[in-house]
């Protein structure tokens, strides 16, 4: 039996926690740092120098030689540049290890080398990173050694946000300010801050390293671009929550240990629906820390996989025909004195503050469904949304029977006199306990579902940063809170006004509530009748962030400027085009150099066999039939390959980012599908010893 792991002892050992700060800083300095962490403001440079020295000393004691400003540019992944603590030797030639407050607070990476949507050019490259004091520094050990990572925001020389974190932090402040107005109106005078808490459920696939290395599509695109279905997929429903394989379990064990050391509260692990698909879920944290930690989770998943001769696939759709991966974004809002604004209590019909919060959220989601849809858009997610494995591309809200009934009563009569209860679940077995049921069931097809004391936004893609969805959620809810607070603060009769607002908002926005089957065709038709947007792709959603309505929202709360939004729209088009271009070129490479030559060779063998058999006096009917089938599909594949080459060349020559992106969507992707179809059919009829790449059966079942 392996040595017992003391989780309490190792948890956070690679993190410069508040506890470690308290041990290493004077009381005066510590209190100043804690004040800025909790309430904002600036540290004096003297204090910053003291904190920097303490942080450096701790890092060096743990083997660190370098530090980095760890930030999240608009690539959606993290970025870092390593600087050593080494400084100029003293007069005696002794090397000093130094780290100043200025180096802690500010860095200067090249802003022109990251996506900026035209905000930064090569001749105006300066950008700044700024220390996010609310997210703790941590140590990462890799081939580079031990690096002190300092979470930072990233902006241009002219002040525009060039990252995912800066708008998130702005949105958190906006939400806190507006939510505080609401809770104070209801008598919570002790609250000084309201925090959005987030818990993302991270799905992923594992694949054997050697098989991965034989698939150019997995290496370059992160997903398979060719592949016939395996004889067995997920139809037996035996993988979800099934027994975890030894190799996968060993990987999960090491992953948990790595994450616990980094202060990530990894809580749940299990097999997901598709073969070789799994999930890890943490405990809730403050939104910006949850965003940082989710990036660490994804990086650790890849890093630990290497140690086990595996590769971790975070793409939303690595394999056709089986479920892809998402990232359920659980979101709640809580005051700093412990009040969860999304807790309905035992009698939600009488919980007026909760009903107002719920009404505001319904208003926010209905009014800005397009923005919420856009916040979960990426190229990979286009393969999932609306495909009977993930929420539809139509935004709706699931409340469950209890709350939907409360809303119905309020809309129809202005009052909710009664509330449905869950009752008892009786198992009928004397040795099993009976227990209280929840008041409502779960709906796995809903994109935005209330689940007891939080909302679960289920559209987010597995490879995507959760910063944008939470920025959008915070912003749209802050706006609804602001409008309600404006009215309530001026109201002559508070009780009457709050009831009027609740009924008005619920009546106006009840169309967004849907408790039924989001996968059904009937819902698509019903959503259209209700006037709900059905935005089917990433690039169709892109323009939603630059509408006058969106710009007014984000500018009102200082989250984005119009220029920042326009740059992000441009980046969306560029990202889409570049991604599809990589996929198209990979298909051209695989089909032209590997698959078609192998099939042509096999067709030659069949032709020789037909000739030999006929010369021997036999009919060769089966061989002839096989040859004709292979030859026909081969010709179809070669023609499709030529077409893909032509349209890819045309796409690459298009100048405008938006025009180019739509050409890739409407023309190049169609040509890619046309090439895949005959090649997947060929895989089913060509000798397996000749087929040049691992099959779905190999990839999903040899882990």
Where would I find each of the regions flagged by the language model?
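Short linear, low-complexity motifs centered on an aromatic residue
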Residues: 76-92, 109-112, 215, 222-224, ...
């Amino acid at each position: 039996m392996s040595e017992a792991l003391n989780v309490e002892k190792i948890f956070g050992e690679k993190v410069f926690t508040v506890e470690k700060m308290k041990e290493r800083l004077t009381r005066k300095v510590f209190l100043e740092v804690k004040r800025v962490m909790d309430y904002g403001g600036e540290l004096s440079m003297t204090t910053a120098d003291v904190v920097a020295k303490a942080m450096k000393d701790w890092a060096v004691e743990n083997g660190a030689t370098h530090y980095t400003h760890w930030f999240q540019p608009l690539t959606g992944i993290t970025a870092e540049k390593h600087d050593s603590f080494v400084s100029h030797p003293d007069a005696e030639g002794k090397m000093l290890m130094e780290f100043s407050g200025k180096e802690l607070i500010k860095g200067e990476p090249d802003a022109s080398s990251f996506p900026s949507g035209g905000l930064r050019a090569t001749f105006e490259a300066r950008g700044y990173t700024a220390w996010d004091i609310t997210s703790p520094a941590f140590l990462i050990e890799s081939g580079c050694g031990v690096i002190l990572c300092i979470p930072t925001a990233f902006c241009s020389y002219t002040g525009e946000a060039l990252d995912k974190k800066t708008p998130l932090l702005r949105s958190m402040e906006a939400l806190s300010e507006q939510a505080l107005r609401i809770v104070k109106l209801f008598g919570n005078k002790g609250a000084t801050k309201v925090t959005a808490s987030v818990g993302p459920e991270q799905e992923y696939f594992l694949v054997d390293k050697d098989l991965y290395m034989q698939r150019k599509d997995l290496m370059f695109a992160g997903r398979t671009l060719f592949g016939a279905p395996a004889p067995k997929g997920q139809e037996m429903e035996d993988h979800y929550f099934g027994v975890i394989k030894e190799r996968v379990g060993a990987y999960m064990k090491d992953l948990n240990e790595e994450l616990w050391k980094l202060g990530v509260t990894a809580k749940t692990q299990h097999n997901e629906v598709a073969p070789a698909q799994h999930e890890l879920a943490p405990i809730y944290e403050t939104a910006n820390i949850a965003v940082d930690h989710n990036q660490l989770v994804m990086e650790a998943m890849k890093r630990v996989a290497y140690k086990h001769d595996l590769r971790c696939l975070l793409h939303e759709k690595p394999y056709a025909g089986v479920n892809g991966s998402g990232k359920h974004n659980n979101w709640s809002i809580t005051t700093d004195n412990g009040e969860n604004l999304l807790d309905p209590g035992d009698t939600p019909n009488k919980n007026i503050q909760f009903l107002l919060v719920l009404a505001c959220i319904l208003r926010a989601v209905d009014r800005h469904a397009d923005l919420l849809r856009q916040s979960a858009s990426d190229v990979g997610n286009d393969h999932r949304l609306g495909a009977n494995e993930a929420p539809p591309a139509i935004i709706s809200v699931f409340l469950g029977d209890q709350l939907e009934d409360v809303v119905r009563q309020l809309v129809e009569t202005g009052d909710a006199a009664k509330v449905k209860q869950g009752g008892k679940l009786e198992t009928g077995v004397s040795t099993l306990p009976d227990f209280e049921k929840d008041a409502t069931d779960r709906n796995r097809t809903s994109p935005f579902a209330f689940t007891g004391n939080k909302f679960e936004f289920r559209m987010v893609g597995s490879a995507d940063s959760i910063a944008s969805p939470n920025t959008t959620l915070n912003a749209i809810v802050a706006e609804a809170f602001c409008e309600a607070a404006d009215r309530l603060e001026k109201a002559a009769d508070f009780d009457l006004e709050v009831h009027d607002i609740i009924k008005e908002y619920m009546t106006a926005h009840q169309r967004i509530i849907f408790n039924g089957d989001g996968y059904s065709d009937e819902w698509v038709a019903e959503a259209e009748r209700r006037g709900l947007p059905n935005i089917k792709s990433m690039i169709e959603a892109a323009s939603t962030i630059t509408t006058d309505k969106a710009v007014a929202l984000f500018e009102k709360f200082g989250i984005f400027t119009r220029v920042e939004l326009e740059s992000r729209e441009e980046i969306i088009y560029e990202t889409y085009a570049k991604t599809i271009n990589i996929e198209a070129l990979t298909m051209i490479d695989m089909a032209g150099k590997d698959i078609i030559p192998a099939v042509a060779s096999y067709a030659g063998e069949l032709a020789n066999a037909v000739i030999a058999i006929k010369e021997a006096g036999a009919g060769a009917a089966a061989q002839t039939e096989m040859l004709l089938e292979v030859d026909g599909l081969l010709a179809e594949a070669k023609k499709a390959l030529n077409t893909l080459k032509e349209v890819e060349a045309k796409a690459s020559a298009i100048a405008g980012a938006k025009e180019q992106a739509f050409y890739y969507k409407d023309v190049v992707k169609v040509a890619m599908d046309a090439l895949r179809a005959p090649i997947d059919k060929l895989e089913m009829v060509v000798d397996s010893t000749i087929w040049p790449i691992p099959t779905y059966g190999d990839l999903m079942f040899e882990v």
